[in-house]
Amino acid sequence: LLEGFLVGGGVPGPGTACLTKALKDSGDLLVELAVIICAYQNGKDLQEQDFKELKELLERTLERAGCALDDIVADLGLEELLGSIGVSTGDIIQGLYKLLKELKIDETVFNAVCDVTKKMLDNKCLPKILQGDLVKFLKDLKYKVCIEGGDPELIIKDLKIILERLPCVLGGVGLDDLFKNIFVKDGILSFEGIAKPLGDLLILVLCPNVKNINVSS
């Protein structure tokens, strides 16, 4: 399947070259692509309209990164491989996943995102997290946590806002009980006990190199 992603003497095709650069430039892109790929892999009840929306989301995500889905499909050689049968959304997503693995993506981040995506699908939660305003809110939170190293108390307030809108990710844990295990100590945002999975997610997905978050059992 991947014979087409290298052209002329092992030089990456335009889609592969663009994707490689975009992944290096932005950690967000891997997270966004992982959500799409894992939604496809775990979406047992996906309908035709769902596949259409996944493909459109993939196109928009790549466009924001400056890449064209058509170029990546061409690099993968899917059209030559499938010919008159036609290239489905599933073919594209499976091909993209194999390409990402060839590009040596961070498997730890990818698997963490997959676990969360599956949980969201199981709880009918995924469509909510893809809402435009919530995506922006999450990106703003990433900036505050990872780049600015913002006020931990304000970050806790932001987390509450997100989780109030996404109770489906809590796995039955009450919001009040969860936040009893999230606190600030010596300027460090700490996650303990039942809040540990949330802290792990923030570190693995939002900012793996962050220094102002502490997670313990």
UniProtKB/Swiss-Prot annotation:
Stable between 25 and 95 degrees Celsius. This is Ranaspumin. The keyword Disulfide bond applies. Disulfide bonds join C18-C67, C38-C114, C125-C168, C146-C207. Monomer. Acts as a surfactant. Is the major protein constituent (45%) of foam nests. Has no antimicrobial activity, no larvicidal activity, and is not toxic to mice. It is found in: Secreted. Mass spectrometry data suggest sequence microheterogeneity hinting at the existence of several isoforms. Exclusively expressed in females in the early oviduct, the glandular part of the oviduct (pars convoluta dilata) and in the cloaca. GO terms for cellular component: extracellular region. Keywords: Disulfide bond, Secreted.
